[in-house]
Amino acid sequence: RCGLELGTQDVYVNVAGGASLSDPGADLGICLAVASSRLERPVSPGVAVCAEVGLGGELRPAGAFERRVREAHALGFPSMAGSAEDCSRAVEGGCLGFQTLCECIDGVLSPASHEGGRFP
């Protein structure tokens, strides 16, 4: 999805402390970490993320989203990227809503930091 061309890549995901991820809200963070590495573009500073990612690349609501936004703000993240549905209901400010993973990659990853990177 999103033109990342990962079919020829070995992708390993390591969770800090060896924890097990069972929260679907972590899907978006994992996907953005992989995209960030592949595209050599960091996540924009001050942005936390939370959404379930469907097999078609659609972003789905994550449980307790409003609580997650408040917690992210308390930890110093002024913005939270998530599903458009969650953000449309959010009372807290600084919510960036997206319909798809591709939209989120374009909206949340910083522009390439150097000319002539390895990937287009």
Predicted regions and their residues:
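Peripheral, non-AAA+ core regions of ATP-driven protein-machinery
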Residues: 1-120
